[in-house]
Amino acid sequence: MKIRFCNGFTKPGFLLVHFEPPSFFAVRSRSLSDSTYGNLCNHKKRPGTGIGLTVQCAIANRRFSSRSLDSPRRERSSRSSSSSGRDRDRDKDKGRDSKSLYSRPSLLDMNKEKAANRAKVYEFLRGIGIVPDELDGLELPVTADVMKERVEFLHKLGLTIEDINNYPLVLGCSVKKNMVPVLDYLGKLGVRKSTFTEFLRRYPQVLHSSVVIDLAPVVKYLQGLDIKPSDVPRVLERYPEVLGFKLEGTMSTSVAYLVGIGVARREIGGILTRYPEILGMRVARIIKPLVEYLEVLGIPRLAAARLIEKRPHILGFELDDTVKPNVQILQDFNVRETSLPSIIAQYPEIIGIDLKPKLDTQRKLLCSAIHLNPEDLGSLIERMPQFVSLSESPMLKHIDFLTKCGFSIDQTREMVIGCPQVLALNLGIMKLSFEYFQKEMKRPLQDLVDFPAFFTYGLESTVKPRHKKIIKKGIKCSLAWMLNCSDEKFEQRMSYDTIDIEEVETDPSSFDMNTLMQPEREEESDSEYEEEEDDDDEEFA
């Protein structure tokens, strides 16, 4: 007997059942009543009754079979395995259908794509002249367009391809995340935009810095060293590398050493403002050896501290390459060893400049103009060390002035050796002093030859008042006796009945080292920052 029926399902499909009754089941009719159909469908195995049934059915394209109604465990197992198989087939079909749209690339594919993008970026950089060899391992933009944006931004800051090649790692900085925040912070501090180009050329690493973690603490530390907030931008412009130093490293040790040798604590802010490079100097390798060498030459440590307060840039002089060779050159030009301390104290720059060419030029000029004996050049330097930096034109003008005043070449030479300042004083003031000397004092020219330092004294403040007192008292004296003393000493001399020649100081240009060791007067100013100026053509008032 075969029974075929169908029933409704929620999903599309239809049910086919092939029923095979047991062998003892007598079939008399080709059709079944409704009750028989219900009994067959609702058949349950009764205890003790063994009825073997074979049911085959198909739903849509899936087939199920059961060999025995008395084996439900086997049926469930079969159904479970069939269901698992169908799930695997469904997953495979789904994977094949959606692979092209939702598949995730493998790590190998990602690395290949990354390498291809990096190759395009390198190709772009090489095309504009940048060598990307040092960029391996550095995180770079994914596309050449983003890299182009970075290069163009650096160009707007004034950096050239050569500048970028000098530090190609700058290409690893994001414009929005790194460059713009750093530059905005520097601008808010007061660093001038016109200095950004040179700033970045000297210290491009600043673009890698974090404003909060790296830059702000350094600025706060500088202010803690008594550098005024208004001076901080100038300090950064002059020495941008300071932004990369550790707070507890070289900066703190260099300041501590300077205070230890006698530099006044209140002067530290001004010193660092004028010469912030000190913050990057190692004490053991740079500062301490120079200070100790000055002591060997005869300059006490406290005097060296005062020199640093006045001229902090002397700490930047190379000891072995410049300072020691210059000291030897001075001795080669007949400067006495005992005079070296006073020479350096008066003009510290003399140990840091390119000295020999200057001395050769000065010797040649004076030998030609006033027939100077080369051996006399040493005494001239001892009296005025700044002489080595005077320009040719001002000196010739002063020599011409003296000869026009009536002095011979020999007298002019004697005056220059006795008081080299006559080669550098303000010519207008010298003319006024000479006119007063001639018309009011009516002294012979030889008095000026004997005491050429007359031109170094203020006409209104010193020369005229003292000359009037000398005339009033009817004293006849030399210019040196009248001028080469303090106001207090001069008043004492006016009370004398006779002139004591021994009181006359024969060398008014001598330098007293003790005056250098006296503490400086504290002067307040709006800003301690002063640009170092070239004093080559400076005239002494």
From Swiss-Prot:
SMART domains: Mterf (SM00733)
Interval spanned by the transit peptide: 1-45
Cysteine disulfide partners in this protein: none
Biased composition (Polar residues): 507-517
Keyword Plastid among record annotations: yes
Region described as Disordered: 66-103, 503-541
Biological role: Transcription termination factor required for processing and steady-state levels of plastid transcripts. Required for splicing of the chloroplastic Clp protease (ClpP) group IIa intron. Required for maturation of 16S rRNA and 23S rRNA in the chloroplast. Essential for embryogenesis. Required for the maintenance of the correct levels of transcripts in the mitochondria and chloroplasts.
Protein name as catalogued: Transcription termination factor MTERF4, chloroplastic
Gene: MTERF4
